[in-house]
Amino acid sequence: MNLVLIFLIIIFSSSLFFYGRSKTKSLAISGNIKLNALPKFYGYYLVLWCSIPALVFLLIWSLFEPVIIKSIIIDTAAKQGAIFNDKNEANLVYEKIKAIHLGTYLGELDSILKESALAYAKFINIFTNSKVVLIFGIIIASTIYSLKKIKNNNKARDDVEVILKGLLFVSSLIAILTTLGII
């Protein structure tokens, strides 16, 4: 599902690039306005403002979703009567529930596992639908914001450079921290 969302974000961002470029060209021609940057920078500005917030949200969601679902399902199984002596037994029951949901479980099913597998399917569905709605909400909100900035004939080149410098800084920081983690 995440690949589909990334693909949709890329397609929407690409279409915004062409829209932003053509919109600024038409504004410059029809209104005799001198643009503060080349039209392509307005397209880049739209792409960055559309894709970066959505991709960051998707990354954060993807990191925390499995942990949250696991804790909810383990709590659900415990409320239904499952007894865990330690963390390993809880993890084993959770993996059984996931296997039942995927249809790969070959062991004996009891009512606790069945109910927990149904709850797992329900929560997966809720989390997936929530993720899609929130990502498209972020895309729409960031697109509206960036389109308002374009209408004001902002200095898109400077803004794009600031965003790219920030991305390069974050990438360098990740590389340094990864190197320190290896050593």
Report each predicted region and the residues it spans.
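Intracellular loop-helix junctions on the cytosolic face of multi-pass helical membrane proteins
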Residues: 151-163
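Transmembrane alpha-helical segments in integral membrane proteins
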Residues: 14-21, 62-65, 129-152
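Membrane-interfacial segments
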Residues: 23, 27-28, 64, 68, ...
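N-terminal prosegments of processed precursors
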Residues: 2-26
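Membrane-interface helix-loop junction between the first two transmembrane segments
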Residues: 18-37, 155
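Alpha-helical transmembrane helix bundles of large polytopic membrane transport and channel proteins
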Residues: 57-137
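Alpha-helical transmembrane segments and their helix-start/interface "positive-inside/aromatic belt" motifs
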Residues: 1-8, 35-59, 160-179, 183
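Extended, highly charged clamp/arch subdomains and adjacent linkers
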Residues: 34, 38, 72, 138-143
